[in-house]
């Protein structure tokens, strides 16, 4: 666990780092020639891409810690549990690198989120991946199916499509990006179609075998 929650560690920050790397690769392979820039023998080092992504995440973690210190906010690394009610509020025990007992009158519980597996599709992080596993893939998969057209799924679909995967996105709703403006969703789908993502709407996922 690290500062920043899902977005910083296993969400939009690392996915956008990989988006940038994959975009550079795609530009070098398919678009630089249009500008008179000829490149031969363009290769990809996925391990370096992943390492750069991890560096970007670490820089964000460090930046958050700096802001906490700058604003005199104490940070304790560990797992917290309410112990009892005491005069002045509640006692919280923190178990971690150093055990601490804290007391607060007002306490905000912000535990973050975990990926939710669908019935019949448990994560094994080998064949069925959560967002965390999808950000750590060591080789470019030949084929990749993404369940749901959420933000992270679409970003990771773009990444792996640019790097050579055949990507299919299964969306249970009958419309693409149903929660956003209809015209924006229409233009976004055009862009993803142009990238080569295959988007199937109204598909429900059963058991994966």
What are these regions (language model features)?
Residues 1-140, 168, 173-177, 183-184, ...:
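Glycine-rich flavin
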Residues 138-175, 179-180:
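Rossmann-like NAD(P)H-binding beta-loop-alpha module
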Residues 155, 162, 186-187, 194:
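Alpha-helical macromolecular-interaction surfaces
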């Amino acid at each position: 666990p690290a500062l920043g929650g899902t977005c910083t560690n296993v969400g939009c920050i690392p996915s956008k780092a990989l988006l940038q790397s994959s975009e550079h690769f795609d530009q070098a392979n398919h678009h630089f020639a249009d500008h008179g820039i000829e490149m031969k023998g363009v290769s990809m080092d996925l391990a370096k891409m992943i390492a750069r992504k991890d560096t970007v995440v670490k820089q964000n973690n460090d930046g958050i810690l700096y802001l906490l210190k700058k604003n005199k906010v104490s940070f304790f690394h560990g797992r917290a549990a309410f112990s009892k009610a005491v005069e002045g509020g509640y006692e919280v025990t923190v178990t971690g690198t150093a055990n601490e007992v804290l007391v607060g009158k007002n306490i905000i519980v912000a535990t973050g989120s975990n990926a939710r597996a669908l019935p019949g599709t448990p994560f094994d992080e080998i064949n069925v991946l959560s967002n965390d596993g999808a950000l750590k893939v060591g080789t470019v998969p030949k084929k990749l199916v993404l369940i749901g057209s959420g933000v992270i799924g679409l970003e990771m679909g773009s990444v792996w499509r640019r790097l050579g995967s055949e990507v299919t996105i299964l969306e249970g709703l009958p419309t693409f990006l149903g929660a956003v403006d209809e015209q924006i969703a229409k233009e976004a789908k055009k862009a993803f179609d142009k990238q080569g993502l295959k988007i199937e709407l109204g598909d429900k996922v059963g058991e994966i075998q």
